[in-house]
């Protein structure tokens, strides 16, 4: 992924630790970082998918903190595998992001290929909705891929407060069409002014 992304999980934990927690009926466990020391992202994605699947089967709710969307594929595969053991579920992905992350997988996976990988392998049971897309951050090729793969998206300017009801109605309609949701957030989908 991007330079500095590996420090993302620890930085997020540090900020979350400052917040008060009032849910006595819930417990939170931190399973540490999944290190990709040798640079083999595919092995790390497989390990993450196995862990995610195990947690879901145990009826835990895994929250994966990544530095980039290079973790999205493994996280999704674990969700998919756990849900398919119970029933044939349709999974909707809601991604708050400035980028589609639909780049073609050429040599090896990276943070920009995750949703293309997911839709290429699981597209018949998966729907993708990207909110906050910034046109200058995505090439014409990526918009063509989004169209080909029937990606739902809203541009960042449409996601502003004045369009709140429109955005909420689109999200509700998306949720209604799917049996399960995978929510993922990339901070570049939000203006630092907010």
Enumerate the predicted regions with their spans:
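Conserved alpha-helical scaffold segments that buttress catalytic/binding sites
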Residues: 1-194
């Amino acid at each position: 992924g991007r330079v500095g992304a590996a420090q993302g999980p620890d930085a997020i934990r540090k900020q979350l630790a400052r917040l008060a927690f009032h849910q006595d009926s819930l417990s939170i466990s931190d399973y540490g970082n999944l290190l990709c020391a040798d640079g083999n992202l595919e092995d790390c994605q497989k390990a993450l998918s196995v862990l995610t699947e195990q947690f879901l089967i145990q009826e835990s709710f895994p929250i994966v903190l990544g530095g980039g969307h290079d973790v999205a594929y493994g996280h999704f595969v674990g969700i998919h595998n756990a849900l398919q053991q119970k029933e044939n579920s349709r999974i909707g992905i809601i991604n708050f992001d400035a980028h589609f992350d639909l780049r073609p997988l050429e040599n090896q996976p990276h943070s920009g290929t995750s949703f293309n990988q997911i839709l290429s392998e699981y597209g018949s049971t998966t729907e993708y909705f990207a909110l906050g897309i910034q046109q200058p951050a995505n090439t014409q090729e990526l918009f063509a891929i989004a169209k080909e793969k029937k990606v739902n998206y809203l541009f960042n300017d449409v996601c502003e407060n004045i369009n709140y009801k429109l955005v909420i109605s689109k999200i509700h309609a998306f949720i209604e069409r799917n049996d399960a949701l995978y929510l993922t957030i990339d901070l570049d989908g939000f203006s630092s002014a907010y």
